Amino acid sequence: MKHCLRFSLFIFALSASAVLHADTDAEVNARKDALELAGAFANDGFMIRDGYSCGMLKPHDHALIAVNLYAGNQYWFSVGTVEPLRKVAVSLYDETGKQMTTENFSNGDKAAAGFAPENSGQYFVSVDSVEDQEGTFCLVYSYK
């Protein structure tokens, strides 16, 4: 009975912490910019995937986000940033760490990378702080 009660309290604490996490203003603004950029790809038939990934980048640092991609699809990974972080680079790696060739876009506080995998599997999107700035970023991606 004690173990059941402890387990129930543990699950309650985990669910409460997930519910209590609220997006910061910086995350909301970065996501707005990322969605604005992804919307441009929607004009070409890309559908924006549910979900997003936000975080903080330190100067000359990077964040890795794991994604599952499917052969035959095309993808755009769109990133929005919030000042003082102004310039980021978006790149893609396969599960062995090999950098993939992507079509790149960069304009002010937004950047994107386009990719069409030959093989289905797990890939890693890298969001890199290019300059001596830190701040919040948000990644969304589109597919068709």
Show where each model-derived region lies:
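Bacterial N-terminal signal peptides that target proteins for export
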Residues: 1-9
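N-terminal targeting/docking segments
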Residues: 2-3, 20-22
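Predominantly extracellular/luminal regions of secreted and cell-surface proteins
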Residues: 21-46
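Acidic, Ser/Thr/Pro-rich low-complexity intrinsically disordered segments
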Residues: 23-25, 52-136, 142-144
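Glycine-rich phosphate-binding "P-loop"
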Residues: 41-57
